[in-house]
């Protein structure tokens, strides 16, 4: 099996930096690029075995276009470490990459991975998803250690959807906790949110079982139960009376659930999907309803059987 020796990471935020730390600890040469880097994008990528995309969803297409314009060949394996959905066409990060790099193997890295905990050396697990078994195995080997357990699967779509959608739910749970609604309400919210995630997965054709793995339920639980989650913090701060702008300034980092909630609301409206939690989050973020009204609306919905 091919062994990765050089990795190029695009993105120098908390997540990209944590991934760099994991790879360096495994002996790989790591180059890291951002828009403020002195090293050029071409020099960062040249002869690297892994190209790791760790920029925000909003910046992914632009960076991918810059890479494509360099015409550096198709030898490297892409690793998508971005979570979110593009607002045009509801494309996942790996699909955006595949559109531009059809000949390169593309993998997805996702799971319950709070960057601060991993950077502190606390144990964690993740998933490398790809339809290319060899590429997945190479990336798995590059990241795996006694503190970071890495699994593989063959459902990149479901893996990415789980990672993107849980951010929206984390905002909702943050609101719930910020309003001090208790453990019962939080548990009900997370459980019904999983039903919404499964509906979206079914719509896009993802495998149901993926959402009960690390990149689905695992990521959902981590993001919805930890104050380290940026999306959870956004919801919590909104419930405390802060504006969205103030909440985002306070966390000083990208909260992908904000844009993903709006994308999901559009999807639900256009395709007739029942996504009441995501819809309420989108309205709350756009300041069309208050946190209290959002909870009241969910509780007042028509009674029904418990069906996914």
From Swiss-Prot:
EC number(s) reported in the record: 1.1.1.94
Q: In which pathway does it act?
A: Membrane lipid metabolism; glycerophospholipid metabolism
Q: Does the keyword ATP-binding apply?
A: no
Which UniProt keyword terms apply here?
Cytoplasm, Lipid biosynthesis, Lipid metabolism, NAD, NADP, Nucleotide-binding, Oxidoreductase, Phospholipid biosynthesis, Phospholipid metabolism
**PROSITE patterns for the chain:** NAD_G3PDH
What InterPro entries does its record include? 6-PGluconate_DH-like_C_sf, 6PGD_dom2, G3P_DH_NAD-dep, G3P_DH_NAD-dep_C, G3P_DH_NAD-dep_N, NAD(P)-bd_dom_sf
> Catalytic positions?
166 (proton acceptor)
Family per record: Belongs to the NAD-dependent glycerol-3-phosphate dehydrogenase family.
Q: What does this protein do?
A: Catalyzes the reduction of the glycolytic intermediate dihydroxyacetone phosphate (DHAP) to sn-glycerol 3-phosphate (G3P), the key precursor for phospholipid synthesis.
Which protein is depicted?
Glycerol-3-phosphate dehydrogenase [NAD(P)+]
Q: Which gene encodes it?
A: gpsA
């Amino acid at each position: 099996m091919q062994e990765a020796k050089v990795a190029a990471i695009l993105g120098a935020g908390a997540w990209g930096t944590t991934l760099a730390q994991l790879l360096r600890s495994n002996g790989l040469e790591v180059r890291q690029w951002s828009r403020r880097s002195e090293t050029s994008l071409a020099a960062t990528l040249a002869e690297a075995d892994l190209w790791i995309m760790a920029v925000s969803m909003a910046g992914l297409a632009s960076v991918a276009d810059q890479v494509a314009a360099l015409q550096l060949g198709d030898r490297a394996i892409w690793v998508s470490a971005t979570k979110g959905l593009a607002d045009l066409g509801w494309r996942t990060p790996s699909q955006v990459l595949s559109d531009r790099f059809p000949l390169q193997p593309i993998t997805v890295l996702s799971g319950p991975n709070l960057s601060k905990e991993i950077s502190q050396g606390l144990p964690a697990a993740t998933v490398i998803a790809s339809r290319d078994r060899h590429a997945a195995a190479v990336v798995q080997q590059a990241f795996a250690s006694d503190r970071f357990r890495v699994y593989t699967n063959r459902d990149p779509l479901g893996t990415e959807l789980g990672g993107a959608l849980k951010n929206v739910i984390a905002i909702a749970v943050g609101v719930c906790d910020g309003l001090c609604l208790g453990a019962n309400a939080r548990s009900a919210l997370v459980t019904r949110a999983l039903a919404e995630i499964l509906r979206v997965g079914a719509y896009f054709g993802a495998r149901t079982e993926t959402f009960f793995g690390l990149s689905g339920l695992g990521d959902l639980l981590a993001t919805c139960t930890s104050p380290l989650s940026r999306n959870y913090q956004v919801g919590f701060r909104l419930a405390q009376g802060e504006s969205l702008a103030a909440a985002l300034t306070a966390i000083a980092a990208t909260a992908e659930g904000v844009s993903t909630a709006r994308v999901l609301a559009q999807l639900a409206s256009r395709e007739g999907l029942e996504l009441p939690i995501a819809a309420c989050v989108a309205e709350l973020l756009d300041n069309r309803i208050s946190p209290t009204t959002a909870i009241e609306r969910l509780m007042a919905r028509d009674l029904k059987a418990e069906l996914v």
